[in-house]
């Protein structure tokens, strides 16, 4: 039920806090405080109020197909409750409660991969989907119109975070803002309040996880091999580290949403969901977002493979070699996962179908 989910949602926040503060530097401690302040503040100050309100209206917190709020709340009350959940589930990084995610990039790269690709952010959007499908109900969201405002806020988060990502020279910062954008795809899928949107959002949890963890682990491999953290410092490294940057290319193309990688299916379902909801402007937003994805990800690859090493950089690339075996092997496995998910996405789709019935 919703209360049990809330308890373990909070435990996840507390158990990952030491990982963010791991380095013990002033910057790491500041980032960890921001992480804890935003995630605990939103969950206790907003999400918990929403949960108590749901119980007062419905008399239960059990997850139920078709939801538990239909006929129990007015359309206006449903909109307010959804706002409390959308902003109270801070791990979904919906603007303006997104700043914990860039702050957490001070953590070691394996932790960043955990936070930004798999555990923490996915707990946020998973909770959003659970609340939308099993507390509100997709049909009730559509009939009440209570999620209409969320469509536009999520679209704003998608585009604005992508634009900010383009301005970041630090590789992990660029990937962090990319994550904020990609998470809002999932929230938007729910807000469309139809089966295709919810399926696309749910599938995007898996496709984004594989693509983004590949990118973060590649960033870690680059740092281990070169001690470089900025995009402007990567010129020519692709020819020295072809495996690492090859895996980065696969992850980037999957995030962009191009075949033959898994991200293409989830984005396609989201576009179909927007068409089904007669939201043509949202279809345009998806298209623009994919172009912005190209603009902030592919220049990293082009610099690495096609630019000459910058003479101002330390050692000018001399002495640098491919990342150690234990660094690049995991990136290759997750990159292959992006490919497998394209050809076998039907299995995931069949697994997810029951949530829309």
List each model region and its residues:
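Hydrophobic transmembrane alpha-helices and their helix-loop junctions in integral membrane proteins
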Residues: 2-5, 14-304
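Short, aromatic-rich membrane-interface segments at the entry and exit
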Residues: 4-7, 350-351
